Curated annotation (Swiss-Prot):
Residues 14-137 form the Rhodanese domain. Involved in the post-transcriptional modification of the uridine at the wobble position (U34) of tRNA(Lys), tRNA(Glu) and tRNA(Gln). Catalyzes the conversion of 2-thiouridine (S2U-RNA) to 2-selenouridine (Se2U-RNA). Acts in a two-step process involving geranylation of 2-thiouridine (S2U) to S-geranyl-2-thiouridine (geS2U) and subsequent selenation of the latter derivative to 2-selenouridine (Se2U) in the tRNA chain. Its EC number is 2.9.1.3. It comes from the Bacteria. The gene is selU. This is tRNA 2-selenouridine synthase. Keywords: Selenium, Transferase. Monomer. The lineage of its organism: Bacteria, Pseudomonadati, Pseudomonadota, Gammaproteobacteria, Enterobacterales.
């Protein structure tokens, strides 16, 4: 066990999906955490704030004493039981606090008093975070190929099929468009970046990489920003463009926006609440681009959406949605993407239907 006491091989820890018992306060965990970490705080947000104020006014010894007074008795025992249960569930896990300082050492000592010898991360979350940032910068230097195409071209599916493909939208829990949100909330920016770094490390470790295959994304995917080092490389990367028939794109979007999302919402919340959430999801997607559509056009498409939802609720048909989706593609999404693609025309190395692009990728 001794060699695990103060782990410092941070890349190996990230590659192994090492369980982390993160004892930072919930607010710290929400701001940024490593994939697979579970948050079992030594101090809750209000307790941490009180200790921090005490530290500034009275010094370290007084702050430490206050911390022990706040986390004592039943509170201490409840948290200790939670840490014990977590270690029993993840015997290969590590304790982690912000910098590998007092919080993880205190929890480690309390666990040792119960007979559990749980190692900790030397340097804490900050060290793991810095490792993730460095790994992303380093791995982003490898060649990149982008998959482009208008909305509904099946780009994400194509990326997922590549052994060296990185599904940025999957990592961001968002499909990129105003209708791109999923039932899973997006991670914080730091947590997204950490997850991306681990994904890059894993793929790099298991593939003989000539290049990464990524979807042609903007600077943001929903609320998450792509790391600047990756964006800079993507801006220079060659692009293979999927050009599928409009009707085929519509069918993909029907499946994605209407059939699958309706299923997911009702599966998660039940028929009535799920339908309400699904309706709000579509309305929110349209509302998000109202200024670019113009308020009159937005109002017209909203009325059409309402009629389509009424038809779907009545007989299950999603055909009515085409009456607002088709003009939305023709008037907004397609012109916007084509304008963006024109600025990168010199980077286009191949274009064709989905299957032709897939075959071309295999031949590279």
């Amino acid at each position: 066990m001794q060699d695990r006491q103060k782990a410092q091989d941070y890349r190996a820890l990230l590659l192994a999906d090492t369980p982390l018992i993160d004892v930072r306060a919930p607010i710290e965990f929400e701001q940024g955490a490593m994939p697979g970490a579970i948050n079992l705080p030594l101090m809750m947000d209000n307790e941490r704030a009180a200790v921090g104020t005490c530290y500034k006014r009275q010094g370290a010894d007084a702050a430490l004493a206050l911390g022990h007074r706040l986390v004592c008795g039943d509170i201490r025992q409840q948290r200790l039981e939670a840490w014990k249960a977590a270690y029993q569930r993840f015997p290969n896990g590590y304790l982690c606090c912000a910098r590998g300082g007092q919080r993880s050492h205190i929890v480690q000592r309390w666990l040792q008093e119960t007979g559990i010898d749980c190692p900790l991360i030397e340097g804490g979350y900050k060290a793991l975070r810095q490792t993730a940032i460095q790994a992303t910068w380093q791995l982003a230097q490898k060649p990149i190929l982008l998959i482009g195409g208008c909305t509904g071209s099946g780009k994400t599916q194509l990326v997922r099929q590549q052994p060296n493909g990185v599904d940025l939208e999957g990592l961001a829990r968002h499909r990129g468009s105003s209708f791109g949100r999923t039932l899973n909330p997006q991670l914080s920016q730091a947590s997204f970046e950490n997850k991306l770094a681990v994904e890059l490390l894993k793929i790099n470790a298991h593939q003989t990489l000539k290049r990464w295959v990524l979807e042609d994304e903007g600077r943001t995917i929903g609320a998450n920003h792509l790391p600047e080092c990756l964006r800079e490389r993507m801006a220079q990367a060659p692009i293979a463009v999927v050009e599928d028939p409009f009707a085929l794109r519509l069918e993909r979007l029907r499946e994605e926006y209407f059939i699958r999302m309706h299923h997911d919402f009702t599966h998660a919340y039940g028929d009535e609440a799920g339908w309400q959430a699904y309706s709000e999801y579509l309305h929110h997607g349209l509302f998000a681009i109202r200024r670019r559509l113009g308020l009159q056009r937005f109002a017209e498409l909203t009325d059409t959406l309402d009629r389509a939802l009424a038809e779907q609720l009545s007989n299950g048909s999603t055909d009515g949605h085409m009456a607002w989706l088709v003009p939305l593609l023709n008037e907004y999404y397609d012109p916007m993407y084509r304008y963006q693609l024109e600025k990168k025309a010199a980077n286009i190395v191949f274009r064709g239907p989905w299957q032709d692009v897939a075959n071309w990728l295999k031949a590279q």
